[in-house]
Amino acid sequence: MHVERQGPYRFCPLCSGTLESRLLKKGDPARLVCTACGYVVYFDPKVAVGTIISMPNNEIVLVRRAIEPGYGLWVFPGGYVDRGEVVTDAALREAREEAGLEIRLDGLISIYSYPRRPPVIIVYAATAVGGELDHDEESIEIATFSADQVPWKNLAFQSTHEALRDYYAGVLHPHCK
């Protein structure tokens, strides 16, 4: 039976028994199940958040990644939502950490997910309301771009392309904040 790559997991986190792939329910993917205690390992998606930040001159903020995946490529500020953290609070935190900016969330652009990839990416449109443009250790540099300057061929992820495309097309759900 084929199981999607589920990491290097071979032993049960509860009893250290051996994990094996089993089909528990028709139509569901195979799961790793402990042969000793029956514990089922579920691999949940990971939630990430991003913000397309508009500056007073109507340019947007992008950062050039200093980490893999996508080293040297451009993305908007974003990152993973911490367990128990409100998604909008994570968006504000990531803008502050990665761009040095305080922002106002203007609305949801969209939610992006892809087959066989764990991240679910929630992207907001935002406006800078304070702080000073500055990058952290996860970025090589930070810059602002007008719509015709966006480095489309040097964007890190499919979600970055799609969210920027949606942003410039005017996709915005202002009541979803």
Please name every model-derived segment.
Residues H135-L164:
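NUDIX/MutT-family hydrolases
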Residues M1-Y9, D166-K177:
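A broadly conserved sequence feature marking short terminus-proximal activation segments
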Residues D44, Y112-L133, A143, A163, ...:
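Active-site-adjacent beta-strand/loop module that shapes the phosphate/pyrophosphate-binding cleft
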Residues E4-T51:
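Acidic, metal-coordinating catalytic segment for phosphate/diphosphate chemistry
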Residues I53-S54, L62, A126, T144:
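Conserved hydrophobic "DFG−1" position in protein kinase catalytic cores
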Residues H2, S54-E97:
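Conserved Nudix-box catalytic region and its N-terminal flanking loop in Nudix hydrolases
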Residues S21-L23, E102-I109:
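A short coil-to-beta-strand element that immediately follows conserved catalytic motifs
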